A protein has these predicted regions:
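Inward-facing hydrophobic residues that define packing positions of alpha-helical scaffold repeats
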Residues: 27-29, 61-62, 311-315, 349-356, ...
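Generic helix N-cap/helix-start motif at coil->alpha-helix transitions
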Residues: 2-10, 21-24, 35-44, 322-330, ...
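Amphipathic beta-strand/beta-sheet edge segments enriched in Tyr/Trp
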Residues: 195-266
């Protein structure tokens, strides 16, 4: 343990390359300290644990170091998480006979409200009216050499779900099919037989919104053809809302056009506010984020670095956006992290309190999240400053916030 990080990293690499695993087990691991020896040495330890198939030790180590400020290594540790979780799944599958099929998630609320104790006071609770609309995942047709089309197939419907919730009273739902691993991306166009089947199951359904992402990728321009359309189930006609070539840089520039065309189609029934061009990473991360928050595979407690990435993305979204939804997104995530990955809270606390101190939670809605932030961090002094404002809140808000407060004020 007296050796510095460079020596330990080199020793691990040499022993590993020469397959001297007993040397690692006997001479390195008993003295290994990730805080002292750093991320590179930790990575080499994880390589050894992978070879020796010690997935429990590896996942414990990965979770332990997620509390450290090693954010530049986030993607590397997420990769390790995925590998060791898969190893754990394989072991557990060999000892069980579980076989879960596909399920359907139907939502018409922002994804931040998932597992956030039904915050009706912060949602659009107006009565939904016709026409009725069903949003389906976009099809992803053709071979691709990047993850962009697959991510976009689910991310765009989730983006539209969030926008429509706040900006319209349309009777709409987003339907996503998923298994115990991920959301399913359709590989073929929706045919008329399938649409007729949906209509037969939902006689009051007026429209289906979906799209196709045609993967004619070539390394010179790295673009894909995106088509977004609405299908009228009553007269069996298709209207194209958008048809463009897109890549990761241009997709956000097309979103205002898509929203405008959608509003025109519905004759102004959708009241989109001033549109902020979001960070493309924030949009493309939506599917993975929802998969983690829903704990599709039951291993979210082992995904500390996945949560770490989502958390810092949520912080950046608050900085870049004036939208209240970004604030709710962050605080709902902090609430879930407190329950399953509390080790992440301390390192992000200075950022959270800087956001509070610099006025990022001053709108009428977002300011009501402050007591929850202070409660998460057991900050009784700041919490007490908001006691009276809580008592003056509307009944729905008071009932909701009381579900989260983990101690009682001294007042």
């Amino acid at each position: 343990s007296d050796y510095n990080s460079e020596v330990v990293t080199a020793a691990l690499a040499i022993y590993g390359n020469n397959k001297k695993y007993d040397e690692i087990e006997n001479n390195i691991l008993p003295y290994f300290n990730p805080v002292k020896h750093g991320p590179h040495a930790t990575s080499n330890v994880l390589k050894y644990l992978k070879i020796s198939e010690k997935y429990e030790d590896a996942l414990y180590l990965i979770k332990n170091v997620s509390s450290l400020n090693w954010n530049q290594f986030t993607n590397e540790f997420i990769k390790y998480e995925d590998e060791f979780i898969q190893m754990k799944k394989n072991y557990e599958a060999a000892n069980t006979n579980t076989n879960s099929g596909s399920k359907v998630l139907s939502i018409s609320r922002p994804i931040w409200s998932n597992n956030f104790k039904n915050p009706t006071w912060a949602l659009n609770m107006a009565e939904k009216t016709k026409p009725s609309l069903l949003i389906l995942p976009f099809t992803n047709i053709g071979e691709t050499s990047t993850s962009f089309p697959k991510e976009l197939s689910i991310a765009l419907p989730l983006f539209l779900n969030d926008e429509l919730h706040y900006s319209s009273n349309l009777k709409y739902h987003l339907a996503l099919t998923y298994n115990d691993k991920e959301f399913k991306v359709p590989k073929n166009n929706y045919n008329t037989d399938y649409i007729d089947y949906i209509k037969a199951q939902n006689p009051d359904l007026d429209y289906i919104l979906s799209g196709n992402i045609l993967s004619k990728w070539d390394k010179e321009d790295n673009r894909y053809e995106l088509e977004v359309y609405i299908y009228d189930t009553n007269i069996s006609t298709k209207t194209t809302l958008l048809k463009e070539h897109v890549d990761e840089n241009s997709i956000v520039d097309l979103l205002p056009k898509l929203l405008n065309n959608l509003n025109l189609f519905f004759n102004g029934l959708i009241d989109f506010k001033t549109f902020e061009t979001p960070d493309v990473e924030n949009i493309l991360l939506k599917p993975k984020k929802l998969e983690v928050l829903m704990d599709l595979d039951g291993y979210s407690r082992d995904r500390s670095w996945a949560y770490n990435k989502i958390l810092y993305n949520a912080v950046n979204s608050v900085i870049e956006s004036e939208n209240d939804s970004a604030r709710f997104d962050l605080v709902s995530l902090l609430h879930q992290i407190m329950q399953i990955h509390p080790q992440l809270l301390s390192k992000v606390k200075p950022l959270i309190y800087n956001l509070v101190g610099n006025g990022y939670f001053i709108s009428e809605k977002s300011s009501k999240l402050l007591p929850l932030i202070f409660s998460i961090y057991s900050d009784e002094d700041n919490y007490n400053n908001f006691v009276e404002s809580i008592r003056r809140g509307n009944p729905d808000y008071i009932e909701w916030i009381n579900k989260f407060l983990y101690y009682t004020s001294n007042e």
